[in-house]
Amino acid sequence: MQNAPESVLNALVPMVVEQTAKGERSYDIYSRLLKERVIFLVGQVEEHMANLIVAQLLFLESESPDKDIYLYINSPGGSVTAGMAIYDTMQFIKPNVSTVCIGQAASMGAFLLAGGAKGKRHCLPNSRVMIHQPLGGFQGQASDIAIHAQEILGIKNKLNQMLADHTGQPLEVIERDTDRDNFMSATEAAEYGLVDSVLDKRG
C-alpha cells in the first residue's frame, strides 16, 4: 500500500496519451521520455534510486547499443556507493552517456555529471555545481572508527584521482578544491572541466 506522500507524488506525474494502430496508449511522462533515451537523476543519490538508474541504463543499452543516452541531473548528492554503482554502469555500457545539469549537481551529483562522455557533458545556464570531499560518520569502538576513517580516506583519494582524470586538473588542485564545499556557476564548471559546455538553447 502506498503511503500518502508517495500517492500524492504519483498523482502529480503527468500522463502522455499516444495514438497507436491498436488504439490509445498512455505513459507517465518519465516512461515516455525513456523511449527517447532520456533518464532523470533527481534528488538524493541512494540505493533504490541507483538501482532504477542502472536498470534504465542497461535497458537502453539492450535496445540500441550505438545510440547515446541522455542523463539529466538535479541532485544534492548522497551515498558514494550508490553513486559509484551508477558511475561504473555509465562507463561499462556501450552507448555514450551525455550528462546535463539542470538545477544543481552537488557532491556525488557533480561527480556523475563529470563522468559523462567526453564532449557530451553540459550545464544549463543557471545551474549550480558543487564539489567536496566525501562525508562520513561512525560510532563504535576506537579500532572500528579507525578502520572506517581509513576507508573514507581511501575513497577520498580515489574520487579525487577520478575527478582529476575527468576534468584534466592536476591532482593537487582537485585535493585543494575539494577540501571544503566548492560551489561553481555553470560557466565556472565548464572552465574547470567538470562539463564541456553551457547550453542555453537546444542545438
UniProtKB/Swiss-Prot annotation:
GO terms of biological process kind: protein quality control for misfolded or incompletely synthesized proteins
Domain of life: Bacteria
InterPro entries per the UniProt record, alphabetical: ClpP, ClpP/crotonase-like_dom_sf, ClpP/TepA, ClpP_His_AS, ClpP_Ser_AS
Subcellular location: Cytoplasm
Active-site residue list: S107, H132
UniProt GO cellular component terms: cytoplasm; endopeptidase Clp complex
EC annotation from Swiss-Prot or TrEMBL: 3.4.21.92
Reactions mediated catalytically: Hydrolysis of proteins to small peptides in the presence of ATP and magnesium. alpha-casein is the usual test substrate. In the absence of ATP, only oligopeptides shorter than five residues are hydrolyzed (such as succinyl-Leu-Tyr-|-NHMec, and Leu-Tyr-Leu-|-Tyr-Trp, in which cleavage of the -Tyr-|-Leu- and -Tyr-|-Trp bonds also occurs)
Keyword DNA-binding included in the entry's annotation: no
Coiled-coil regions listed: none
UniProt keyword Transport present: no
Major localisation: cytoplasm
Keywords, ordered alphabetically: Cytoplasm, Hydrolase, Protease, Serine protease
Function: Cleaves peptides in various proteins in a process that requires ATP hydrolysis. Has a chymotrypsin-like activity. Plays a major role in the degradation of misfolded proteins.
Family under the similarity heading: Belongs to the peptidase S14 family.
Assembly and interaction partners: Fourteen ClpP subunits assemble into 2 heptameric rings which stack back to back to give a disk-like structure with a central cavity, resembling the structure of eukaryotic proteasomes.
Protein name (database record): ATP-dependent Clp protease proteolytic subunit
